[in-house]
C-alpha cells in the first residue's frame, strides 16, 4: 500500500489582528479601540477582565484546524506579548509549541509591523524549508494578499483563517 504524500504545514498568526477582530465581533464594531486604554491601564478591573474573558480566542481550535492539513513544522504568533490582552495567551500558546515573536508597541515598531515581519519570515521559510506544502495565514487584513499570492506562486497551498465579518474579501479570494 502506498503511503500518502507527507504534507508539511507552516502556521503564521497575526495575533494582535485576530484578538482585536474577535474582541470587536463579540463587543461591537470598534469596541477594542474604545476599550484599549482601559485594558492597558487596568486589565484586572472586574469589568475589563469580564470583557476580555468573553472575547477569549479558542487558540487550540485554530492550531487543531491547521494540523488537519498535515504535520505542523512551525507555528509562530506575532504580537506585543507584554500587552495584557495578549499576555493571557502566552502559556496556552507555548503549551501548543507556538513560537512567540515579540513585536514592540506600535509607536516604536510601526502600525503594520506584524504584517511585515510575518511576511518576511514566511517567504524566508519557504526557501529555507522547501518541503513546506501548506501555509496557514491567521489574520484578516488585505495586507496579506501579496503574501498569499507569493506562497501560491512558490507552489504552496494557502489557507486563510480569520474572524467572520472582518476578514478582507480579497484575502479570502487570494487563498486556496
Where would I find each of the regions flagged by the language model?
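Receiver (REC) domain switch/active-site residues of two-component response regulators
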Residues: 176
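Domain-level signal for Mg2+-assisted phosphodiester chemistry and nucleotide/NA-binding surfaces
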Residues: 1-121, 127, 152, 157
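A short local structural element in Rossmann-fold oxidoreductases
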Residues: 23, 148, 172
Amino acid at each position: 500500500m502506498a503511503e500518502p504524500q507527507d504534507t508539511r504545514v507552516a502556521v503564521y498568526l497575526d495575533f494582535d489582528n485576530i484578538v482585536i477582530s474577535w474582541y470587536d465581533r463579540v463587543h461591537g464594531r470598534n469596541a477594542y479601540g474604545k476599550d484599549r486604554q482601559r485594558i492597558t491601564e487596568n486589565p484586572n478591573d472586574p469589568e475589563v477582565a469580564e470583557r476580555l474573558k468573553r472575547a477569549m480566542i479558542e487558540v487550540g481550535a485554530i492550531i487543531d484546524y491547521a494540523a488537519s492539513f498535515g504535520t505542523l513544522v512551525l507555528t509562530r504568533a506575532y504580537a506585543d506579548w507584554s500587552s495584557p490582552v495578549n499576555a493571557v495567551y502566552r502559556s496556552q500558546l507555548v503549551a501548543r509549541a507556538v513560537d512567540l515573536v515579540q513585536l514592540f508597541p506600535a509607536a516604536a515598531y510601526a502600525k503594520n509591523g506584524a504584517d511585515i515581519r510575518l511576511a518576511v519570515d514566511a517567504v524566508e521559510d519557504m526557501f529555507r524549508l522547501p518541503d513546506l506544502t501548506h501555509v496557514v495565514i491567521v489574520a484578516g487584513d488585505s495586507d496579506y494578499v501579496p503574501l498569499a499570492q507569493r506562497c501560491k506562486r512558490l507552489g504552496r497551498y494557502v489557507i486563510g483563517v480569520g474572524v467572520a465579518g472582518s476578514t478582507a474579501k480579497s484575502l479570502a479570494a487570494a487563498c486556496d
